[in-house]
């Protein structure tokens, strides 16, 4: 409710309990009742679904209200400041995922001349290539789920959650940019915001279009194959693919994601220091979404809520297991980084209205333990790559091993498998053959505990290899975020080992850009 009142407009924040199918009219009525009338405007600050009591599932909404009946002052709103000035500096960014896009956008806004080099294709072309891949099984180096415009996140659930507490300004900038590019405004206040792959495929190109309008350049379907150095600095990178040649620059940002093993090895060969870091591996589980809904809500659907989601953990002493990247109403996809590997991931659209739900079930994995002692970053990549190849070599194809959860926890052999969202074949298999014994035992125990927490969990299927929860290695970054031994090299995003997910990676890209700007004189 708008007002042109000349009286002082005060501010207050209120919390409302609302039915899941509340209307805009009901929301305004409840606000008016809470502040005892008067003219007011409002905005939703936070909204979460409270399903602790299945007989009384509702939204809890935190509302910021401005009204002539209130006396409080509104909170100070801080925004990320990007100062534009004339600069004679060229920045070459490798990778067009969240970190690369937002680092590039900020730097281009600040007056730098930025070129993005991306191994994969533009989003629309990438979608065509993926469709062809799923029909033929022929892997396209430039058109898979891992690489291309928007990174792996373009073909995901588009989750925008982040547990990082030190990125509030960067996070707000990311959300504002996404909303401006077409994301639903609700992402700014949902406790578990998500965009959906169908919307991301339009939003990301819109952001890239803004970047280009500012003068930025993007080279798709080309990969960095060589690094040229001049003393303690990188002077240029060599690229091959749709474009071939040498790209010179004053600063270089590698935002290549954690599936680019070739780039990791190139950087390591140039003396960039990486170390191993904790990460997790496991498989995907899939259920009928209706069964998940009923287990969580005791009803098949809930008006006003797209689909039920779960977040499960299990104490598997020693160690633990947990669900990761749950995709309600989604599907499982073959997210192989190359033609000899097999890795699964989950994705869903904005409506989350598919028949199936899927999630990773993973447990921490020690590369040192697998190697029998201390291990270099390069050797760590070899170990993980070998595991990804093992899943491909199972059938020398992108079909994947799978088993019913009930058979896994009872030690039985799976004879047949139910219908699945996966676009390739599921092959009944003994999943214990693909994992180190201690890893598999933790995963199995985790499944047993999850079956006690969700009564439909035993009805599901485990499938494939989930190995991309986070990077297996981490680069050494100086206080100014440069990567030793170079003074003009920055490594950010998931590939750096310092972030995970769309928002934290985008924020890391922004922080990298700001640090570069601060050091540029």
Segments (PLM) and residue ranges:
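Residues forming the flavin
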Residues: 4-57, 63-155, 159-177, 181-521
């Amino acid at each position: 409710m708008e007002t042109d009142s000349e009286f002082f407009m005060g501010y207050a924040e209120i919390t409302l309990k609302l039915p899941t199918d509340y209307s805009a009219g009901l929301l305004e009525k409840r606000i008016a009742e809470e502040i005892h009338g008067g003219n007011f405007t409002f905005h939703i600050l936070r909204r979460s679904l409270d399903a602790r009591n299945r007989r009384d599932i509702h939204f809890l909404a935190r509302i910021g209200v401005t009204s002539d009946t209130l006396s409080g002052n509104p909170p100070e709103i801080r925004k990320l400041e990007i100062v534009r000035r004339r600069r004679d500096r060229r920045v070459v960014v490798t990778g067009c995922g969240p970190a690369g896009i937002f680092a590039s956008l900020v730097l281009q806004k600040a007056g730098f001349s930025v070129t993005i080099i991306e191994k994969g294709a533009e989003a629309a072309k990438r979608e065509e290539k993926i469709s062809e891949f799923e029909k033929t099984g022929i892997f396209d180096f430039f058109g898979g789920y891992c690489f291309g415009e928007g990174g792996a996140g373009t073909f995901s659930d588009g989750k925008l959650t982040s547990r990082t507490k030190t990125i509030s300004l960067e996070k707000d900038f990311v959300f504002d940019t996404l909303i401006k590019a077409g994301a639903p405004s609700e992402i700014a206040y949902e406790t578990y915001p998500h965009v959906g792959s169908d919307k991301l495929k339009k939003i990301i190109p819109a952001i890239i279009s803004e970047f280009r309008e500012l003068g930025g350049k993007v080279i798709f379907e080309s990969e960095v194959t060589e690094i040229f150095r001049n003393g303690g600095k990188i002077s240029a990178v060599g690229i091959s693919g749709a474009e071939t040649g040498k790209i010179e620059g004053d600063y270089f940002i590698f935002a290549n994601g954690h599936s680019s093993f070739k780039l990791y090895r190139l950087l390591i060969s140039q003396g960039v220091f990486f170390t191993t870091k904790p990460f997790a591996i496991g498989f995907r589980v899939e259920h009928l979404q209706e069964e998940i809904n009923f287990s969580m809500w005791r009803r098949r659907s809930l008006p006003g809520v797209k689909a039920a989601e779960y977040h499960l953990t299990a104490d598997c002493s020693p160690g633990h297991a947990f669900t990761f990247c749950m995709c309600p109403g989604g599907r499982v996809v073959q997210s192989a980084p190359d033609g000899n590997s097999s890795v699964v991931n989950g994705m869903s659209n904005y409506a989350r209205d598919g028949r199936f739900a899927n999630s990773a079930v993973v447990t921490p994995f020690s590369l040192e333990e697998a190697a029998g002692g201390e291990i270099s970053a390069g050797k760590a990549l070899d170990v993980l790559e070998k595991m990804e190849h093992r899943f491909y070599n199972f059938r020398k194809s992108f079909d994947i091993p799978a088993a019913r959860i009930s058979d896994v926890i009872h030690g039985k052999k799976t004879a047949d498998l139910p219908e699945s969202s996966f676009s390739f074949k599921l092959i009944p298999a003994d999943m214990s053959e693909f994992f180190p014994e201690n890893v598999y035992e933790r995963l199995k125990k985790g499944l047993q505990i999850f079956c006690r927490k969700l009564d439909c969990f035993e009805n599901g299927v485990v499938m494939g290899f989930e190995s991309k929860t986070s990077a297996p290695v981490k680069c050494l970054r100086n206080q100014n975020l440069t990567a030793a031994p170079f003074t003009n090299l920055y490594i950010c995003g998931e590939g750096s080992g310092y972030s995970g997910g769309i928002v934290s990676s985008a924020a890391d890209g922004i922080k990298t850009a700001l640090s570069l700007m601060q050091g540029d004189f």
